[in-house]
């Protein structure tokens, strides 16, 4: 099924606008910072940046704006890697403070060209944010670091509140969806390592609509639960351009609702954000705090609970 046909009504969004959106964009430009919201053309950009009742969520993309890998679903540019910007950790922390974020998501391109995959730079950014304000919640959405457990530990040791790594799709479809250097078992190993650590929650995300079968999604939820993942999200894959992987199907909102119920009630995930427009970082702060409140936890209690896991 071609993704070039007319999108269903539930996938139509309005372009981002408003004072809050403009303020955040200007702050990012002033500090020459990248966000995955913009680089990957996320459809929720305006919604997340504006927030519903607070300052919202922004996802900063570290280590440059070009990736060393070429996943067939992703709109981030590949190749031509630049040196790391030594001022980026401080600039990100300053932007977080200026915008007034109380929940920030940090992600990065893959940097297989660097000895540590960029883990040290990533970790330093987390520490810079926490140095300025220990109350800011930090979610680190990390690459697989080519299976380097020491690199993953460097992220964990920087004390983020949530560490995410996206498995992206079911095992059968890892290729052609992801770059051949990625792999299902390698991603499960990263998530297992995160889940075994003290003081943070483990999170992952899957795209639907790339040709997966329901029993494969169910099995993937089982695998994720088995390695200790706390949070999972589901969203519709949308083709960034005609040169990218085609959409196999547009999954209905009702189907996304079913997967949310299965994930939370049958597999016991802390929460599952599931919907056609959901992305890994979609309203991450709002949903995380709501999930903690449902469990009767405040932020400090949640951190203590994570340390006891």
From Swiss-Prot:
SUPFAM superfamilies in alphabetical order: Radical SAM enzymes
Pathway(s) this gene product operates in, as recorded in its UniProt entry: Protein modification; protein lipoylation via endogenous pathway; protein N(6)-(lipoyl)lysine from octanoyl-[acyl-carrier-protein]: step 2/2
Gene Ontology cellular component list: cytoplasm
Subcellular location field: Cytoplasm
InterPro entries named among the record's database cross-references: Aldolase_TIM, Elp3/MiaA/NifB-like_rSAM, LIAS_N, Lipoyl_synth, rSAM
E.C. number(s) listed in UniProt: 2.8.1.8
Cofactor note: Binds 2 [4Fe-4S] clusters per subunit. One cluster is coordinated with 3 cysteines and an exchangeable S-adenosyl-L-methionine.
Binding site for [4Fe-4S] cluster 1: 37, 42, 48, 281
Stored PROSITE patterns: RADICAL_SAM
Protein name per the record: Lipoyl synthase
Segments forming domain Radical SAM core: 53-270
Record-listed [4Fe-4S] cluster 2 binding positions: 67, 71, 74
NCBIfam families cross-referenced by the UniProt entry: lipA, PRK05481.1, PRK12928.1
Keyword entries, A-Z: 4Fe-4S, Cytoplasm, Iron, Iron-sulfur, Metal-binding, S-adenosyl-L-methionine, Transferase
